[in-house]
Regions:
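Low-complexity, flexible helical/coil segments
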Residues: 69-70, 78-83, 117-120, 129-130
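Interdomain hinge/lid region at the active-site interface
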Residues: 74, 86
């Protein structure tokens, strides 16, 4: 629990200092997987790690452009933490699913200028790693 809480604090600190918070965000998700002691979840995160860093870079850049998005993410992380801390597996699962669903919605609601500017640059390495030759 301590690592999860520390990762939330580190993420907030990084963003307040003007950083993108990508590394800290990925560490938050890894801390949850480690706390769950679920080998499948840990293995999946390790495998997806090659894509997770790039995807998180895209989502964090989009969220940094809008205070409402940034606040939503912070609130979602806090809800996940609180559910885990309370030992409420169902609430943790719902909170995590909501976080993933909302991440997709935030990308869908990204300002078109995001994709014309940094979004496309950030997403390109991710797309080419998934679809070589793209």
């Amino acid at each position: 629990m301590k690592r999860i809480r520390q990762s939330i604090a580190a993420l907030e600190k990084a963003v307040l200092a003007g950083g993108d918070g990508v590394s800290e965000d990925v560490k938050f998700h890894r801390a949850i997987a480690d706390a769950a002691r679920n080998p499948f979840l840990i293995g999946t995160l390790e495998y997806l790690g090659q894509f997770l860093q790039g995807a998180t870079r895209v989502t964090r850049a989009n969220e940094a452009r809008r205070a409402d998005f940034a606040r939503q993410v912070a609130d979602e992380h806090e809800h996940i933490f609180q559910a885990i801390e309370a030992g409420d597996v169902a609430a943790a699962r719902r909170s995590a699913a909501r976080h993933m669903d909302n991440a997709i919605k935030r990308i869908e609601q990204a300002d078109p200028s995001f994709w014309q500017e940094e979004g496309m640059k950030l997403a390109h390495p991710l797309v080419t790693s998934l679809h070589p030759g793209a």
